[in-house]
Amino acid sequence: MATNYHDITIAFAGVCQAVSLVQQFAHKGSADREIFANSIKSLLVTQPDSTLAVFDGQLANLKLGLETVQAQMGSPNGKLDTEIGRYWINVLALSQKLNKNPEAKAKLAERLQQIERQLPLYENDIMADQMIANLAAIYSDVISPLGSKIHVLGLQDYLVRPDIQQKIRASLLAGIRAGILWQQVGGTRWQFLFSRRKILNQAQQFYKSI
């Protein structure tokens, strides 16, 4: 079966967008609310009709992720950010560990269902502070025990703040969700060695169409 770089690139852009948000929260203490919301909302899309449907069917919802893919895969306009590279490699590794752990996957699904049930209490706003705190707790309880912790670099003033810690963990959880999607559509780590150009070309095409 032919490798589906269309869907692989969408899913990888989801991972890259999530880890770019992590970096922004850690270094700047903030990130674009709409971009953050696009990543967080993907956590509640459990039965999508297509890969893009996870991100509400809009490539524009992955703009930051597509920019990051281009920079990471060697676009002449982008410079390699090794910090971001370390984050997405670790997120993909953790998502692969999750995929091989049926108990953890079941626990994650159960906790996300709880989030959905709680939404009406917060006027269906997944971005409510308590919702972000609950998503962060899922990352700590379900994902962190799967493997070595992702060491996030940034300004200490931000990293010690509980609200920033929660946004970082919620972003990482969105990255894990995209990492699971990446595996489901045929993503493998070998592709980053042998098919970087194909992923880059696809990301460039997507970006031009936004």
Swiss-Prot record:
Say which domain of life the source belongs to: Bacteria
Please tell me one Gene Ontology term that the record gives under cellular component: plasma membrane
Q: Which residues form a coiled coil?
A: 103-130
Mainly localized where? cytoplasm
Topology relative to the membrane, per the entry? Answer: Peripheral membrane protein
The cellular location(s) given in this protein's UniProt record come to: Cytoplasm; Cell inner membrane
What is the protein name given in its UniProt record?
High frequency lysogenization protein HflD homolog
What is the originating organism of this protein? Actinobacillus pleuropneumoniae serotype 5b (strain L20)
Task: List the taxonomic lineage.
Answer: Bacteria, Pseudomonadati, Pseudomonadota, Gammaproteobacteria, Pasteurellales
